[in-house]
Amino acid sequence: YFYSGFMFFYNLGRNHKMPGSAQEIRYINRDENTHLWLFRNMILELKNEEPELFTPDRVDVYREMIKEGCRQEIAWGHYAIGDKVPGLTKDMITDYIQYLGNLRCMSLGFEPIYEGHEKEPESMAWVSQYSNANMIKTDFFEARSTAYAKSSALVDDL
């Protein structure tokens, strides 16, 4: 249930409303993208180590799981946002979530689950400008670091 929520705040941000909230959502989105990258890599490694888990029948089950997740995300977006928020429509929500479902499938080496949604919808290209932490440029002297700070670990010799 992330992207329907993210796009609501990003829509506010692109309309110059609540920019601080949009920035906070970007931090959350960045963290979720880190989790996405981690689990994608774990699944790809599992594909190499345990290929019997990725037979055509099992891949069909996995694709159906992704499709069900998309269905629930779309239903939530329609309920929470619907056609009541200026700048967002149910069709935009559906198109974008179906695109993300295809993106997730293809990144795992699976066939897309939604025909015609292999590319980011033009009506939603602005979401990428907010969701990709590397795409928004700021004035170097006015910007705060958004990177995680490295800490030195104490070594316990017990």
Language-model regions: role of each:
Residues 1-158:
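Non-heme di-metal
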